[in-house]
Design a protein with these regions (language model features):
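Glyoxalase I/VOC metalloenzyme domain signal
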Residues: 19-26, 31-52, 69-226
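N-terminal low-complexity or amphipathic/hydrophobic leaders
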Residues: 60-71
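Glycine-centered flexibility motif
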Residues: 3, 54-55, 61, 219-221
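A short beta-turn/loop motif at secondary-structure boundaries
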Residues: 57-60, 133-135
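N-terminal export signals
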Residues: 1-18
């Protein structure tokens, strides 16, 4: 049974605030790749599941392929879009030596409220800003994204999907369910402070190099990626 991000077990209370565990709060995990086919093949080789082409991000210079991680959660394989060669590669995807997890997004039902909560906790935000993706069927999927000042590695952004729009997890091939989501960073206290300011708890560990570690229960067994 796949995990639903709204399950009651995903919530805890601390000092009167309602906290979500990152494993339930995340909307999607971004796996960066220098080439989309290479990223799709990298996942398929490890899991036996082939991602579905998601579409292009107009003006962003990227395109993606998707895999569902349960209701309200998905893995996004993102890579440069050859059809947009003049758009700067802001994430440095084309320079990646191999596919790896580069970012994560947290779901918000009210992006304005998320912004107010974060700023009340002393966290600087960017936006919200509109985003869009053109699906293969020609339909445009739209959202609002709220950025957080990157004072430490692994800080997420927050996303609110346009009302009535189908969530990308709803029609993407099923990869499996999330067993664990871990964050390794040289600055665990700073990352923890930022996440708690947005009412998110996470498994954060101190290491020399920052990375996001996702473990998925697939038909082939547990698969770890970072």
């Amino acid at each position: 049974m796949l995990r639903n991000r709204f399950a009651a077990s995903s919530w805890s209370t601390t000092s009167g605030l309602l906290f979500r565990d990152a494993k339930d709060a995340f909307d999607h995990i971004l796996l960066g790749a220098p080439d989309l086919d290479r990223g799709v093949g990298w996942i398929e080789e490890r899991t036996g599941v082939r991602a579905q082409f998601g579409g292009n991000h107009p003006g962003r210079g990227t395109r993606n392929a998707l895999l569902s991680l349960g209701t309200g959660h998905y893995l996004e394989i993102i890579a440069p879009d050859p059809a947009q060669p003049n758009v700067p590669d802001e994430r440095g995807l084309g320079r990646l030596p191999s596919p790896r997890i580069i970012q994560w997004a947290v779901h918000s039902d009210d992006i304005a409220a998320t912004k107010r909560m974060a700023e009340a906790a002393g966290i600087k935000t960017i936006g919200p800003q509109p985003g869009s993706r053109q699906r293969p069927d020609g339909k445009m999927l739209r959202w609002q994204a709220l950025g957080i000042e990157q004072t430490t590695p692994l800080v997420p952004f927050f996303i609110q999907w346009q009302k009535g729009a189908p969530h990308p997890s709803s029609d993407a091939p099923e990869l499996g369910s999330v067993k664990s989501l871990r964050f390794e960073t040289p600055q665990p206290d700073e990352l923890r402070r930022i996440l708690r300011g947005a009412a998110v708890e996470a498994d954060i560990r101190k290491t020399n190099l920052p990375r996001i570690v996702l473990t998925v229960q697939t038909a082939r067994g547990e698969v770890e990626m970072s």
